[in-house]
Each structure stands twice: as C-alpha cells, then as structure tokens.
Amino acid sequence: MYCPFCQHDHSKVIDSRVIDAGSAIRRRRECSKCEGRFTTIEKAVLLVVKRNGVTEPFSREKVVTGVRRACQGRDVSDDALKRLAQQVEETVRSNGSSQVRANDIGLAILDPLRELDEVAYLRFASVYKSFDSADDFEKEIRLMRRRGRD
C-alpha cells in the first residue's frame, strides 16, 4: 500500500475494524517514512457469473430490488429485505469461492423468502423457475405445504 502523502510503499496497521456487517475491514495505517496516517478499506470481491458468461460484482441492492418486486403489495419491511439480502450474501460467500453463478443466488433467495412471505415466494419462484401454467403453481404450493409439515 502506497502512502498517499509521500508514496512510500511500506506502512504499518495501527487499528483494524470489521465494517459493513462483516463484508469489509477498515484499517488505520501509518507510513513508516513520513508517519502520515491514512485509512484503507479492504473488501473481498464476490463476482456473479451471469448466464451469458459476463461477470459483475455481487450487489445486495440487486437482491433487494428483485425480492422487493415479488413483495409488492405485501407487508414486508425494508429491514426484512435487507436482512434477507445479507443472509443470501452470507450463503453464497460460504462456499469459499470468489465467483458465484447467478442461478445459485436465485436458489439462495428461495428458502429465506419462503420463510418471510409465502405469497412473495410464489411470485419470485414463478419467475425464477419459469412457471408455464397454473399446474406449476399448484405443484409448488404442494411442495411448500409438505416442507411446512417436516
């Protein structure tokens, strides 16, 4: 890390703190040459591999936006959506890879969304799983009821 004041390439860490709900680390550093102090933020980048092969950084906000559409008209708070997005990010990061397929993000959304709101779950699942008929909805509802009894 280069010092922003004198461009020296060595500094020591004075303080480290976890920020952004554990997704980043804030480090306070001191240059070993000029003793200038500066802050760095380190974040592990998680890349999403889309169906067409293009990659982009993971975005909790995209998860919230997608789920919010499914929750439209439902009594689901923004805080609940943010918690769900955090849970999804934790799930996809837990595999230890720096890349995740977009399809895996959709799978990671399904279970917590079903627990949050069943109607929103059905709406999201109908798009994610490409439902073609009312029969698809009926099958999914039967699956939900079976899982509810387990």
From Swiss-Prot:
Its cofactor is Zn(2+). The keyword Cell inner membrane does not apply. HAMAP family: NrdR (MF_00440). NCBIfam families: transcriptional regulator NrdR. The gene is nrdR. Negatively regulates transcription of bacterial ribonucleotide reductase nrd genes and operons by binding to NrdR-boxes. It comes from Corynebacterium glutamicum (strain ATCC 13032 / DSM 20300 / JCM 1318 / BCRC 11384 / CCUG 27702 / LMG 3730 / NBRC 12168 / NCIMB 10025 / NRRL B-2784 / 534). Binds 1 zinc ion. A zinc finger (unnamed) spans 3-34. Keywords: ATP-binding, DNA-binding, Metal-binding, Nucleotide-binding, Repressor, Transcription, Transcription regulation, Zinc, Zinc-finger. Belongs to the NrdR family. This is Transcriptional repressor NrdR. One of its GO terms (biological process) is negative regulation of DNA-templated transcription. Residues 46-136 form the ATP-cone domain. The lineage of its organism: Bacteria, Bacillati, Actinomycetota, Actinomycetes, Mycobacteriales.
